[in-house]
Structure formats: structure tokens, C-alpha cells
Amino acid sequence: MKKILFLTVICFCLSSIKAYANNNIHLSEFKNYLRTIKSVAIDFTQEDSYGKIVKGKLLIQKPYNFRCNYYPPFPLVIIGTKNFVSMYDYDMEQVSRISPSENIFNFLLEDNVDFDKDFVFESVINKGNIFNITIYHTRTEKRSEITFNKNIKQIEKLKIFEDHNIVTITFDKITKVQKFSDDLFKFKNPEIFSPPERLIKSEIEKKYVVSSK
């Protein structure tokens, strides 16, 4: 009986070690994927717990710049640079700012060193070609769940867990970009200058050149 129990414990330990090793491999693949992201345009659909659905395009120009461009009638645009993340509300005509480390897309901008410093991997769940990663952002004390497709090596979904809401962002199409128009990532004081340009899909796609690679 003791021998059987001992063998069972050994088998369990070996299975745990194998699972841990596999998780480390998948996490390494995920980190490598993040490192390869340089300049991209991402079509996305965002839905919250209350059923509100909005669409937009996320532009990333590493290491610091991004633009979360929601399409009308949703009234927000979020522009991030090295020093600030600025959000403009076209309906309220108001600006709010946070530090770059607090923005919800920060993990896409981090390099490997900063990622390990600012984020904690809490769990990895494998489901065939998909694995779900739960990460904890130490600076904002928020959790997110990332759905990563191992076959095509691409993020498919991001869930952001807020106090009374869950925001689910589905990445519909990811395009590599050769060059962005500089004005996409500039945010001037709307009280002195005009507000950031409000762009629909066809307009924003004229402001970058798709990479041929």
C-alpha cells in the first residue's frame, strides 16, 4: 500500500514538473511574441459586462507610442507617449491623464525586462492550440486574461477585470506597419489648439503604410 502511494506521489510530481516546464515554454513563446511587436495596427471589438459594444483600431509604435482610436459614436480617443497617456472625451470636451504604466495596453509596449518587473504570471491554462494567461499588474493592482493562439502566435483576446465590470477586447486583425503619420501620436492642449482629430476607419488607415514583409 505504501509502495503504491509512493509511486502515485512520484507520478503526480513528475506530471506537475512536466506541466510547469510546458507552461514555461508557452510563456517564453508569448514573451518572444511581445518582443517581436514593433509597429502594428490592430482592429478590435470591445464589449463590457453591460453589453456595450464598440469598435476601433489600436496603433502601436514601440517603445512608447500608442493610439487607441475608438470609432464614432463612442466619444473617446487615448494617446500614449513616453511621458503621458492622455484620454480625450469628444462629448464632454475633457482631457484626463495617467502615467504610461497605468494604461491597459501597457503589456504590449513592455520589453522583457520591464514585463517581469511590472507583471506577475498567475496562471496558464492550455486548451489545444489556445492558452489563457492570467497576469497581475503590480502598479495598478489589476488582473487581465490574455488568450494567445500558439499556432499563429497571435493574441486573440484580452479581458480586463475591473471592480464592477469586465472589459473584453477581441483582436480581429493585426497588421504590421512600415510607417505611421507623426500626428497620430501627438496630443496638444485642446484649450489652446484644436482637439485630436476624430478618425473613422477609412481615415485612420490612410495615415499609415502597411509593411510588405
Curated annotation (Swiss-Prot):
Query: From which residue to which does the signal peptide run?
Result: 1-21
The record's annotation in Gene3D superfamilies points to: Lipoprotein localisation LolA/LolB/LppX (2.50.20.10)
Which InterPro entries would you find in this protein's record? LolA/LolB/LppX, OM_lipoprot_carrier_LolA-like
Please name the Pfam families in this protein's record: LolA (PF03548)
CDD domains, alphabetized: LolA
- PANTHER family the UniProt entry points to: OUTER-MEMBRANE LIPOPROTEIN CARRIER PROTEIN (PTHR35869:SF1)
Protein name (record): Uncharacterized protein RP864
